[in-house]
Amino acid sequence: MLPHIGYFFNRRLLIVCSIWALPALALAQQVAVKVEGDYPQLQDNAEAFIGEVEDRSANSLRRYAGTAESQVEDALRALGYYSPVIQWEIIEPSGEKEGPARLVLTVQPGEPVRVRSRKVEIEGPASEDPDFGSSLPPTPAEGDVLNHGQYSSLRQTIRNRASRLGYFDGEFTSRKLEVDPEKRVADITLIYRSGERYRLGEVSFTEGHGFEEELLEKFVRFEPGETFHADKIARLNTDLSNSGYFSGVDVDASPGSAEDGVIPVSVGLTTRPPRSVAAGVGFSTDVGPRLRGNWREHWINPMGHSRGVETELSAPRQNLSTWYELPLDPPMTDSIRLSAGYQREEIEDVESELLTFGQQWKHQLDNGWQQVASLRWEGERFRIGADETEQSALLLPGLGYSKLQADSPLDPSRGYRIQFDVTGSHRAALSSVDIAHLNFLVKGLYTLAGNHRFLTRFQFGGVATNRFSDVPPSLRFFAGGDQSVRGYGYETLSPRDDKDVAVGGRFLMIGSAEYQYQFADNWRVAAFVDEGNAIDDLADPLATGAGLGIRWISPVGPLRLDIAKGLDPEFGGEWRVHFSMGPEL
């Protein structure tokens, strides 16, 4: 009878074979394994299986040699080599050489066992479920060298997928790995009978949370009777956790509580403290030191309304704003926010005081785009250069779309941001000037080979009006600074009047390309070129800046330090240091 080895293969051996791709573990000096030929996986597995051996005499090593030989055999079998030739010898120090005796095992792997046949079948309702059968691990495939770790992974993937999709009564009706070492072949048979797929039942919330059931039900994205999927439960947990209402969320959808294949969903909620206060100090070369603070009441009634106050203080800019927000359906993405704010700003030769009142309706489209419809009133008092102080009053309806795709919120390796906003006013609707205002921004980030990052940025803006001199500074365009064109002062790029005062432009055009190289954990160097300007005519010249920088990836996001040279002295280009922080996208 040919020897066979079943699915119950040594558990320890299967665990070790799963680490074949890890760097080799350092061994004690008293035992060494030498696998002849180019077999780094076998070498690593054998060394890992033996582990550390130390403080042994030569005689002790001789007694241990048989055990070590068996361990190496098991390690090689895990990767499909069942017929190795292993020789060992004891090397003792001689003459003036000092040190302990060493056991050296020399291994000739021999020919491997290959997979002769692979039979993987899903029976029952899961056989018609595309989510179940798709993308099962292709290895070990017919003709491959047998790898017990891959076989174990295939088996576990089927189990995990059944649990994730709700086939909780599933079982293997046949689970065999038959190996014939003499013929050097292996046959794999995995037949899984899924049973019926469970469904989700009603969602209930434990008492004492303080919110209306109608609000909480809006967080549930599935209907009773839908098929079970673990992702639906995880999404409910995440949405409730991110709502800002709760400090603890526990979603229980255990199949043990099911009746007739329907699982009731129970949600336990721990309400967070209703109010929080935060303050912080920051710095950028655009505005210098700044102080930020906010007070927020995360919920003020059972309907989940919230409100807050925010302020930012720096030498050139001071602002104070307050807001009141009402959640819509779904509350994770949709809301109405009422706001009011005051801002005072003095930059270069422009002074302004801005008072705003408005509302925003945020709505996420099915394709992932965020839509913001707004209506705000702005009253601005401003002075440009030595001109007299002027005032404007504008009622500005607006519409904006944005989308952010990134693989990490703080330090993504790839992704993009697209943002488009349009707003306007008309003298027939409580406004002092006719305006159509457009702003478009796109950023892209791509990482190649782990260490090479490429960032691009393009921004375009435009304002159409019957009388540009009546357009307030907050709706004109200025360029230059940390987040604009480096190598030039903050908002110094702009058309100028006959007194050389920057008055702001009708158009904004900015492009940037940056390369980063990661040379150490959390550290990158950068090289960049920026080009752009605030202009009155699209044919007007642009300013160019270039430079080098360094990036430190802090726990709160990247910190950027750049040294840039403005290449156009007629626009005020010079050597400048720029410091800023925040996500790349």
Regions found by a protein language model. Name each.
Residues L2-C17:
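Bacterial N-terminal signal peptides that target proteins for export
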Residues I15-V16, A26, L240:
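Cleavable N-terminal signal peptides
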Residues A21-P23:
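N-terminal signal peptide c-region/cleavage motif recognized by signal peptidases
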Residues Q29-P40, G51-T285, N294, G308-L326, ...:
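Periplasmic polypeptide-binding modules associated with outer-membrane biogenesis and secretion
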Residues P125-D131, H229-Q419, Y446, F454, ...:
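Gram-negative/organellar outer-membrane beta-barrel architecture
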Residues I263, N451-F528:
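Extracytoplasmic gating/loop element in the C-terminal half of outer-membrane beta-barrel translocons
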Residues R290-R292, V372, L396-G400, D421, ...:
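One-face residue pattern on beta-strands with alternating periodicity enriched for small/polar residues
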Residues A340, Q359, R417-H426, V433-N466:
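Transmembrane beta-barrel strand/turn architecture of Gram-negative outer membrane proteins
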